[in-house]
Amino acid sequence: MNSLGNLENYQKGFNESVVDITEPRIYFGLQTNDTIVTNSKTKKEFDYLSPDGSNVTNEYNGQAGLKLGFFDRMVFAISHGDTKLAFSSDISSESKIIANRNIINRAKAIMPYLVYDENPYLVVSDEGRLVWVLDAYTTSNYYPYSQKITVNNKEINYIRNSVKVLIDAYDGTTKFYITDRTDPIIMAYWKAYKGLFVDLDEKIPEGISKHFVYPEYLYNIQANVLKRYHNVQADVLYRAEDVWEVSTYNLTGNSSNTISQIQPYYTMVKTIDNSQNTLGLVVPYTISGKQNIVSYLVGSYQNGEANLKLYTYPEDSNVLGLMQLDTQIEQNEEIYKQIASLNVSGTKLTKNIVVVPVNNKLLYVEAIYQQYINEENALPILKKIVVASGNKVAIGNDLKEAFSNLVSQNAIGIEIENTEDIEDLIELIIKANNNLEQSSANGDWEMMGKDVEKLQSLVKKLEETYNKEKSKNNDLDITLDNTENKTENEKDKVI
């Protein structure tokens, strides 16, 4: 990567796939919190800098805002505590005041009974206009026989993504579309506030709906609940025997205090049951206390519908976990040297890792950044990329080089081991035996049968693990004996 970060390649990509935007100006967004006055009599609105260095100005022609008569100016001046608005000579009869420009606050002011996603996204309509997509939810804490969770200091046990709010970034036009008619709460709101929602028969324009993604707010809640409730067997749930955790990784690689859970992220995925690449949210899981990845959750938007699917690996699969990848990197002298050379005085290293499903395999991409800690406002600089797939790992200065090394002879083989050792199995056997004693004391014959099967399975697994460890130790003893014999023979030759 050159000093410009290959900007010429990015520019080339933009030129080849031009997005036709007819109105690029954003008056309504996430950071637009101030009330503004447009079309001033004396001051022109700065738009952009022309190639010759002169300022290009703009006049607002949208329908948003109120034209200000003298009485209106007095009212706004009093409400905002600003006398300039009332007596400024810059304001004419063509001037407009535009308020409520923060799109989330704007939606809340219109319909305060919904919960709004904190991560709206901007799309381009077929007409070339910028439109914000804001997901909205109905919630309740009265759903029967359902466990409550706390979200933003509020207890809920019911949530539905029943509304899509579309907000024009230029003129602030706000439309509420009902996307789930099976939700009784939103249908009650529809009957109570019929003028608020778009007609049920009116569909969201395809030029906008084709850009929809799985809502991150809902996904985070579902991914968290799934850690326990992926298993629907009552006895397993009651005993909390099959609890998952979101995979963790080391942010810096040099301190256990920097271990962090991987955050859900949008990426292009190609799952085993879908021939097309799809933009989706992904998070991998491990069994609580273990390191191997056992499953991953994909949230995507396909064929106009939200789709959430869990992909699990067989119990005996050894799928590389994120902490295991870090360990393999540290144990490999060639890769570790390249990373360690970046950790010089006055700098710190940070990492970010994503796991990308490709068919039934996982591709691991780890970016390593260097940042100068003594420089004010110093930005992290991408220095290395580590990629891994299957039992191979490679490193490069950029993504292209890392991938090239992964599929070449430069790739390094890694050993993926199941993290379940003999001590872990003994703990599980003790727990299973306690469960058997409890079900026996309760006279629960069905549960006793399940507990006996579980105990037998664990004992068998312990025996297999023990024999495997014993065989490995025997091989090591043979190797050491051969080494000692070879050394003695060499001594005899010298004598």
What do these predicted ranges mean?
Residues M1-N442, E446-E469, N473-E484, E490-D492:
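Soluble extracytoplasmic regions of secretory-pathway and membrane proteins
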